[in-house]
Amino acid sequence: NGYYLKLALCNKFSLNSDQIILGNGSNDVLELAARTFISTGDEVIYSKHAFAVYEIVTKAVGGIGVKAKPQEDFGHNLDEFLKLISEKTKLIFIANPNNPTGSLIEKSKISAFLSKVPKHILIVLDEAYDEYLRDEDKSIAFSWLAEYKNLLISRSFSKAHGLAGLRIGYGVGSKEVINLMNRVRQPFNVNSIAQTAAIASLDDDDFIIKSRLINDQGRLQLEEVFNELKIEYIPSYGNFISFNLGDETKAMMYYQHLLKNGVIVRLIQNYEMPSWLRVSIGLKDENNTFIKYLKSFT
């Protein structure tokens, strides 16, 4: 049951253990939410350019995905979410910051949104990239749990904590929501090595601060080059930047050129952004390698 990791999370964030569920990555938590609360024919709302897993887990359990039109800056349009709520709506996925756009919703807007959503609809707030945010932008979602029993917050150790290969994440919600999810969860879904590493990482604030600093520096490095080359990009609050090459053919040409030179970027056609690529922010030398081959093809 992950006793010691739950204890560490309780001490870190002033939570109770019955508010926490552990997952084989936060992806597991998202899937557990879908399997627990969605039945065949139920509707699930998420943004058009949101994390692909939302659609995958919705379809896997027989749910119907309802895509909300994004804002002009590709961010979540919460007013559109509200318009799409119907009698069949059972769950809403919101990523903040969002993948692959890197956009961020202001805390005040999320708080106002929560107050308008019917209480029987579960709201899953995916905060996998929260550790990359500046202190003034960081989530205060845990403080909303007392008022909103229909809120589930998912977090990950795969990003700023650097434990992606170990597969460890967690969800935080009301004890009622967590109890229902635990009935669906496989009893041994998280291995002991991942739990031990996660406990250690929770105590290593210096590493998180360093990771955020390096990420901030790398983001500025890449943004400067995109501005120089007049390449459109989405200002990002995560550890990646999505940039637009104008059309799908050109995006594929750049993708293949970079790949041949040992630089792996992400095609995001499946996010309905066919002319865009997403590049992860790396160390300075890694970013320089990307920049070198980006410029050599421009």
PLM-predicted stretches and their roles:
Residues 7, 36-94:
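PLP-dependent aminotransferase-like
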Residues 72, 216, 228-261, 277, ...:
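Conserved PLP-binding catalytic core of the aspartate aminotransferase-like
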Residues 150-234:
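PLP-dependent aminotransferase class I/II
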